[in-house]
């Protein structure tokens, strides 16, 4: 499904709007710095390459073709999106540089208004975000809109990785569902940025 291809893209860029509402007493400056990895408004600068960690949480996870850090979780469960590839450039992502995603897949059913996605963002062991989003509202950020027609989908998006990304391991997972709670897809990505 394109909507979840958006989640492949949104798995790293999707939390932009919702992350702004996160507030933890006394930890806000630290959280803001960690969350800045998802902010696309930061200026460019030189940086070190992060390490992509291709470890899979469970026996039911499988890598998505394209040599990216994205894996399909719950792969044995029927999903409406057959994600064929996700290519990122540069690979691995670099601080202070633009990152281009190209995702390709086949959606087996139209996705209509009311679809939603559950997103978790972690910084190491710290859960920064657990929130449910309106999928159709979020995909407008990557120039798509509902209904999304079944069939072949290709999504390309360019985002900026802030130069101020704090070092550490970032884990993003997203599970998308139709308005009738039919499983669209589950994607997860893990990227580790080295110390500056």
From Swiss-Prot:
Keywords, comma-separated and alphabetical: Lipid transport, Signal, Transport
InterPro entries: Ig_E-set (IPR014756), ML_dom (IPR003172), ML_PG-PI_TP (IPR033917), NPC2-like (IPR039670)
GO BP term, example: intracellular sterol transport
GO cellular component: fungal-type vacuole lumen
One GO MF term attached to the UniProt entry: sterol binding
Signal keyword on record: yes
Prosequence residues removed at maturation: 22-60
The UniProt record lists the keyword tRNA-binding: no
Signal peptide, first to last residue: 1-21
Pfam families, alphabetized: E1_DerP2_DerF2
Subunit and interaction comment: Monomer.
Function: Catalyzes the intermembrane transfer of phosphatidylglycerol and phosphatidylinositol.
Family assignment from sequence similarity: Belongs to the NPC2 family.
Matching PANTHER family: NIEMANN PICK TYPE C2 PROTEIN NPC2-RELATED, PHOSPHATIDYLGLYCEROL_PHOSPHATIDYLINOSITOL TRANSFER PROTEIN
Name the record gives this protein: Phosphatidylglycerol/phosphatidylinositol transfer protein
Gene: NPC2
């Amino acid at each position: 499904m394109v909507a979840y291809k958006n989640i492949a893209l949104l798995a790293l860029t999707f939390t932009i709007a919702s992350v702004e509402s996160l507030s933890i007493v006394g930890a806000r400056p630290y959280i803001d710095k960690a969350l800045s990895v998802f902010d696309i408004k930061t200026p460019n600068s030189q940086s070190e390459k992060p390490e992509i960690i291709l470890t899979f949480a469970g026996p039911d996870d499988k890598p998505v073709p394209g040599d990216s850090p994205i894996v399909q979780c719950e792969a044995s469960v029927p999903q409406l999106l057959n994600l064929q590839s996700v290519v990122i450039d540069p690979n691995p992502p670099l601080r202070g540089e633009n990152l281009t995603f190209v995702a390709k897949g086949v959606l087996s059913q139209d996705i209509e208004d009311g679809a939603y996605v559950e997103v978790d963002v972690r910084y190491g062991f710290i859960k920064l975000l657990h929130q449910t989003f309106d999928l159709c509202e979020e995909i407008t950020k990557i120039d798509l809109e509902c209904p999304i027609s079944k069939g072949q989908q290709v999504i390309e998006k360019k985002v900026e990785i802030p130069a101020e990304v704090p070092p550490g391991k970032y884990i993003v997972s997203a599970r998308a569902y139709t308005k009738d709670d039919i499983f669209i897809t589950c994607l997860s990505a893990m990227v580790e940025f080295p110390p500056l």
